[in-house]
């Protein structure tokens, strides 16, 4: 460690650790095994729910609509990739104390975590636009959201999430790490890694804020605008039944937005502004729940709130093979 500290005085020397140590949840190391139990249970529920939903939407012709395409073939698959990138590694830390992660593997995990969450945010935005077209322009729905348009929207969302995250590993690689290689976290997250650097991280912070604006803030603004127009259109409906139907078609999506963005914004602001007021253990727990809780609850929320999915699930378990 003294050698690392002395090297910081020489800006021409670039120090890159061969690996990082993911220390888990700081202050709660003795109860890691107990913390892992609900996380593992949620992960199993998450796998069953999302894989089952992907299969159901593929299998059931009555669910071959844009809304379910976004949810089943996009949101569920992205959730599967995101959680599988982080949770098995966290369970290895909790159960077997396998805390070491290669430097490049850490950068890869960081890229995938941020990239997939960026894509997920875009999918939620597209789902809001889908609801806007369905409620405000119901007669044009089938001609507006055609398969080519859906494919282009999904591709644009994916490319935005991936391309904006590509600089993160390179911004981290340029930094010298001469203090410690111990990360108080269960996975490699951009701010957790760069805080270990002994050089200025101003560029990393600025770029991170820019990405947050281009993805999180932009998507929230689009979602808010969509639901403002939806609310305006629903209120103008003359029939109370029509208004009720319009609102009921949005409740599942609104629930998904809340359980996704609330922990996401907590994690974002805690990293940057809550270092002295928010306990590190709380921050790490919420960061894990942010990646695991929404994907676990989404199939349940959509199954409860969406009549077509409920009917398809019942139909599937009754063994009815006919197309819906």
Curated annotation (Swiss-Prot):
Transmembrane parts of this sequence: 34-54, 63-84, 109-129, 149-169, 206-226, 247-267, 284-304
Membrane topology (UniProt): Multi-pass membrane protein
Extracellular-side positions: 1-33, 85-108, 170-205, 268-283
Coiled coil (UniProt feature): none
Domain of life of the organism encoding this protein: Eukaryota
Subcellular location: Cell membrane
Signal sequence range: none
GO cellular component: plasma membrane
GO molecular function, one term: G protein-coupled receptor activity
Keyword set, alphabetical order: Cell membrane, Disulfide bond, G-protein coupled receptor, Membrane, Olfaction, Receptor, Sensory transduction, Transducer, Transmembrane, Transmembrane helix
Topological domains, Cytoplasmic: 55-62, 130-148, 227-246, 305-324
Disulfide bonds: 106-198
Similarity-based family: Belongs to the G-protein coupled receptor 1 family.
Its biological purpose: Odorant receptor.
Protein name, per record: Olfactory receptor 52N5
Source organism per UniProt: Homo sapiens
Gene that this polypeptide is encoded by: OR52N5
């Amino acid at each position: 460690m003294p050698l690392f500290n002395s090297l910081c005085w020489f800006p021409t020397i670039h120090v890159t650790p061969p690996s990082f140590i993911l220390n888990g949840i700081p202050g709660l190391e003795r109860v890691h095994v107990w913390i892992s139990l609900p996380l593992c249970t949620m992960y199993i529920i998450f796998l069953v729910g999302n894989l089952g939903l992907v299969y159901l939407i593929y299998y059931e012709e009555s669910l071959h609509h844009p809304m379910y395409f976004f949810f089943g073939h996009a949101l569920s698959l992205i959730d599967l990739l995101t959680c599988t990138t982080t949770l098995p590694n966290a369970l290895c830390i909790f159960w077997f104390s396998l805390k070491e992660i290669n430097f490049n593997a850490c950068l890869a995990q960081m890229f995938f975590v941020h990239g997939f969450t960026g894509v997920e945010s875009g999918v939620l935005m597209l789902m809001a636009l889908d609801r806007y077209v369905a409620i405000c322009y119901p007669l044009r729905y089938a001609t507006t959201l055609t398969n080519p348009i859906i494919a282009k929207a999904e591709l644009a969302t994916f490319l935005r999430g991936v391309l904006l995250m590509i600089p993160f590993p390179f911004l981290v690689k340029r930094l010298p790490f001469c203090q410690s290689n111990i990360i108080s976290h269960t996975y490699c997250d951009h701010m957790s890694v760069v805080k270990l650097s002994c050089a200025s991280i101003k560029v990393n912070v600025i770029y991170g804020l820019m990405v947050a604006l281009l993805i999180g803030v932009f998507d929230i603004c689009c979602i808010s605008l969509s639901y403002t127009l939806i609310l305006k259109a629903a209120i103008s409906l003359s029939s109370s039944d029509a208004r009720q139907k319009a609102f009921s078609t949005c409740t599942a999506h609104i629930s998904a937005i809340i359980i996704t963005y609330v922990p996401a914004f907590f994690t974002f602001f805690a990293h940057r502004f809550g270092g002295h007021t928010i306990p590190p253990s709380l921050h790490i727990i919420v960061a894990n729940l942010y990646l695991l809780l929404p994907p676990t609850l989404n199939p349940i929320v959509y199954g409860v709130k969406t009549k077509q999915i409920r009917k398809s699930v019942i139909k599937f378990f009754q063994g009815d093979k006919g197309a819906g």
